[in-house]
Amino acid sequence: MPRIAGSKKLKRQMAPMFWGISRKSPRFVTTVRPGPHSKQFSIPSAVFLRDTIKLVTTAREAEYAIYHGKVKVDGVSRKSVHHGIGLMDVVELEGVSDIYRLVPKKGHLLEPIKIKSTEKAVKLVKVTSKTTIRKGKTQIGFHDGRSLISDTKVSVGDSCLMQVPEQKINEVLPLEKGSKVLVTKGVNAGQLADVKEIKEGTFVLPKRALLSFGNREIEIPSDLVMVVGKKEPIIQIA
């Protein structure tokens, strides 16, 4: 059987800061394998359990929980210690009452927050692609790697409130003037803002969003924001 490309481990000094790992422990740490989120924007499930939320103390304990199907991401058991957990993913563990959602916070790319059990079956996903396939149907791609064939009218940059793991779209949140957005990357990561204007991209400039943070305004690429509601966030993100 061919070996999956890529190393199973990573030097601790090279790991992203948002993983929350100690730099003075053993030399290597579990890394992310190709999956729903890109390597630089996700946390390996084993690292998440041991270092981020500290529910276990050793890699062996993390492996036991994961291999025995005790860890669910978006309602599906994930049995790989290399599975990448990323933006807006909902994580629950068998026998533990706390449920976590990963969001940007205080300039950090990803941090877990505890959410109510009533929210574990819903997730916000950002539309990253639209493709017309056979018979005129539309395939929609989302930021977490999932895709869906649907007649729902959406545009790239919009967000969808999705039922998981069924992958049913409950509501569409368009990226438009007046939308409430969450900055997902950069120095303003984790901050909520109101969209004042959407500026279409040009040959040399990407699509941009003019955002209001109350007493200040900034203009950033629309790729760095995610719609989370109209006036207020429709799910818990803090």
Model features per residue range: what roles?
Residues 1-238:
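Ferredoxin-like alpha/beta domains used as RNA- or RNAP-binding modules
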